[in-house]
C-alpha cells in the first residue's frame, strides 16, 4: 500500500480531455508521485476505463477522484471522495458517498478510500457552478473550515481548489497553519515551476492539471518541486 502522506506532487488528468501517447508517457515517467483521474463533467465509465488502461502500464499509484457513481470501477489504488464543505447543496456534502455506500458498501476496501474536505474557491469554475459552492470566503472562513476538517471531522485530506486560476497564497498559508493532522492539497492554476515552488512551500501536496493540456513542458517542470522539501 502506498503512503499518500509522502506525496508532494500529483498530476490530475481529465478523462474527458484528449492527451497524446507521447504526452501521457512524459507525464507518467516524470517522477510525479501519483496520477489522479478526475473531472467535473463528461466523466463516464468508458472514458475512465480508457484512460486507466493507458496509465496502468506505468508503475506509479493511480487514483480515481469520484465525481459520479457511474464511473466508479475496480482497478485503482485509491478512491478519493470529495465532500464540498462550502456547497449549498447537501448532495455534495455526502450525497456521492451515500450512493457509493448503497451501491458498493458490501465490497468497499476502506483502506483504499480517502475522504477529502473540499473547499472550492473560484466562483467562475465549472466545479463551483456544478456544486453550487459559496466561494465568497474570507480568510477567517477558510481557517474555520480548516479547524472543522482537522479537529472535528478529522478528515485525512483538505483540498483547497481554485480550479483554473492561481490561488491566494496568503489564504492557503492561513489554512496550512490550522492543519496539524490533516494533509493539505492545493490545486488550481499552477502553470510554472515558480508557482509550483511557491505553493509547495505551503501545501503538503500540489495538484497540477490544466497546464498539462496547454503546455506539457511547463507541466513537467512543476515536478522539480520534489527536489526540495517543505
Curated annotation (Swiss-Prot):
Name by which UniProt lists this protein: Heptaprenylglyceryl phosphate synthase
Keyword Transferase (UniProt): yes
Species of the source: Staphylococcus aureus (strain JH9)
Similarity comment text for this entry: Belongs to the GGGP/HepGP synthase family. Group I subfamily.
Subunit structure: Homodimer.
One Pfam family from the record: PcrB
Catalytic activity: sn-glycerol 1-phosphate + all-trans-heptaprenyl diphosphate = 3-heptaprenyl-sn-glycero-1-phosphate + diphosphate
GO BP, sorted A to Z: glycerophospholipid biosynthetic process
Record key words, sorted: Lipid biosynthesis, Lipid metabolism, Magnesium, Metal-binding, Phospholipid biosynthesis, Phospholipid metabolism, Transferase
Cofactor: Mg(2+)
Disulfide bond annotation, renumbered to this chain: none
InterPro entries from the UniProt entry: GGGP/HepGP_synthase_I, GGGP/HepGP_synthase_sf, GGGP_HepGP_synthase
Enzyme superclass (EC): transferase
Residues that, per the record, bind Mg(2+): 14, 40
SUPFAM superfamilies (UniProt xref): FMN-linked oxidoreductases
EC number annotated for this UniProt entry: 2.5.1.n9
Example GO molecular function: magnesium ion binding
Stated role: Prenyltransferase that catalyzes in vivo the transfer of the heptaprenyl moiety of heptaprenyl pyrophosphate (HepPP; 35 carbon atoms) to the C3 hydroxyl of sn-glycerol-1-phosphate (G1P), producing heptaprenylglyceryl phosphate (HepGP). This reaction is an ether-bond-formation step in the biosynthesis of archaea-type G1P-based membrane lipids found in Bacillales.
CDD domains attached to this UniProt entry: PcrB_like
Pathway membership, UniProt: Membrane lipid metabolism; glycerophospholipid metabolism
Binding site for sn-glycerol 1-phosphate: 12, 159-164, 189, 209-210
NCBIfam families per UniProt: GGGP-family, PRK04169.1-1, PRK04169.1-3, PRK04169.1-4
Amino acid at each position: 500500500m502506498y503512503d499518500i502522506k509522502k506525496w508532494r506532487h500529483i498530476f490530475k488528468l481529465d478523462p474527458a480531455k484528449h492527451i497524446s501517447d507521447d504526452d501521457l508517457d512524459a507525464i507518467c515517467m516524470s517522477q510525479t508521485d501519483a496520477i489522479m483521474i478526475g473531472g467535473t463533467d463528461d466523466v463516464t465509465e468508458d472514458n475512465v476505463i480508457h484512460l486507466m488502461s493507458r496509465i496502468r502500464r506505468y508503475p506509479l499509484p493511480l487514483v480515481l477522484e469520484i465525481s459520479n457513481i457511474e464511473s466508479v470501477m475496480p482497478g485503482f489504488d485509491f478512491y478519493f471522495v470529495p465532500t464540498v464543505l462550502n456547497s449549498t447543496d447537501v448532495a455534495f456534502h455526502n450525497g456521492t458517498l451515500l450512493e457509493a455506500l448503497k451501491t458498493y458498501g458490501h465490497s468497499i476496501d476502506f483502506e483504499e478510500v480517502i475522504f477529502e474536505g473540499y473547499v472550492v474557491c473560484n466562483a467562475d469554475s465549472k466545479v463551483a457552478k456544478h456544486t453550487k459552492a459559496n466561494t465568497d470566503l474570507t480568510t477567517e472562513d477558510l481557517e474555520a473550515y480548516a479547524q472543522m476538517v482537522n479537529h472535528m471531522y478529522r478528515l485525512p485530506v483538505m483540498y483547497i481548489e481554485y480550479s483554473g486560476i492561481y490561488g491566494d497564497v496568503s489564504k492557503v498559508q492561513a489554512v496550512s497553519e490550522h492543519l496539524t493532522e490533516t494533509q493539505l492539497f492545493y490545486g488550481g492554476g499552477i502553470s510554472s515551476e515558480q508557482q509550483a515552488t511557491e505553493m509547495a512551500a505551503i501545501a503538503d501536496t500540489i495538484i497540477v492539471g490544466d497546464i498539462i493540456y496547454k503546455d506539457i513542458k511547463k507541466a513537467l517542470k512543476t515536478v522539480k518541486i520534489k527536489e526540495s522539501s517543505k
